[in-house]
């Protein structure tokens, strides 16, 4: 008489004990976490939605809200995103509404121009590249010509996962050279501001420009090494 075969089945995995914070999480555990990047440096989608409602109360047509925000952020790229910035011109869809009037709505919902612009930084980056028109102040920052599109103060938002992603993605990502040039210009400006009331500058700071940091003819690797050294010095001067 044949012996009936017995099949062995693998035991079902025990449910993970998620009450124990000291238990090492598995990759499957981590996949269950639906995290969205947030930072106080970037306005939130909810804040942008509230801002849109305020724009409509000013008389902006509902279908013009998003383009008005893109235009506003692009205008800030020319003058820098600060409370003291003075915006000229009107919103494209309604000549009766000035950009300055739209910008005043930031303070109603307690966000800064920089937070607003950081949210739209990737949109602005695409606008700059698509039009082939760099920020108006790029030359004043001392940026080399091949880094001119990085010449706006909320450029780092282009690299932030908390910023709004264009539907088609970036036209191109920023180059390492553009990232380094922006960083050098940023810390150079902070250092000079800190020393504005001083009678003398450190010798290396007197002669340091973004051009001297990234434009001296040399190999790409040496470019980055020189930039990193100069940027480190600037951070020390700024107390950063």
From Swiss-Prot:
InterPro entries per the UniProt record, alphabetical: Pltvir_coat
GO molecular function, one term: structural molecule activity
Biased composition (Polar residues): 1-10
Chain's role: Required for genome encapsidation. Forms ribonucleoprotein complexes along with TGB1 helicase and viral RNA.
Family named by the database record: Belongs to the potexvirus capsid protein family.
Protein name: Coat protein
Keywords, ordered alphabetically: Capsid protein, Helical capsid protein, Ribonucleoprotein, Virion
Record's subcellular location: Virion
GO CC entries: helical viral capsid; ribonucleoprotein complex
Transmembrane segments: none
Main subcellular location of this protein, as a coarse class: virion
Residue ranges of the region described as Disordered: 1-27
